[in-house]
């Protein structure tokens, strides 16, 4: 399985022949919705596949720079850390999206928004948990 990554998390594609051919993408999120980024897959022992990603759930359109001198319109690395799941190996994804609760760290509390807006960076590759 592979994810098509752009700012909308277009979908997952499946291959059953080791990557020689791929099925059509299955959307994880609604096309044209808010930014979703930095997705990573996890296959659990039960067979359930999770996709974890950043989501601009509050539809923030611009942010202040760390020194408050500039307005920045790149908004794909902020918001909420969320997940959806698939019980059919990526043929479909849960309707429900789940926010992952986390505690604020000093870097969150010290950002220009005092932790009311969080910034994320998630880089990874798919993995299987046995």
Segments from the language model and where they lie:
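Asp-box/BNR beta-propeller blade signature and adjacent active/binding-site loops
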Residues: 1-130
């Amino acid at each position: 399985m592979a994810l098509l990554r752009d700012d909308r998390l277009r979908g997952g594609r499946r291959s059953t022949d080791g990557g020689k051919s791929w099925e059509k993408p299955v959307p994880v999120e609604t096309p044209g919705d808010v930014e979703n980024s930095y997705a990573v897959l996890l296959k659990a022992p039960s067979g359930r596949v999770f996709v974890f990603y950043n989501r601009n759930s509050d539809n923030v359109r611009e942010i202040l720079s760390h020194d408050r001198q500039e307005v920045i319109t790149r908004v794909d690395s902020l918001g909420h850390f969320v997940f959806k799941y698939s019980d059919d190996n990526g043929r479909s994804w849960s309707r429900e999206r789940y926010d992952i609760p986390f505690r604020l760290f000093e870097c969150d509390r010290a950002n220009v928004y005092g932790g009311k807006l969080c910034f994320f960076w998630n880089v990874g590759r798919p993995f299987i948990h046995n």
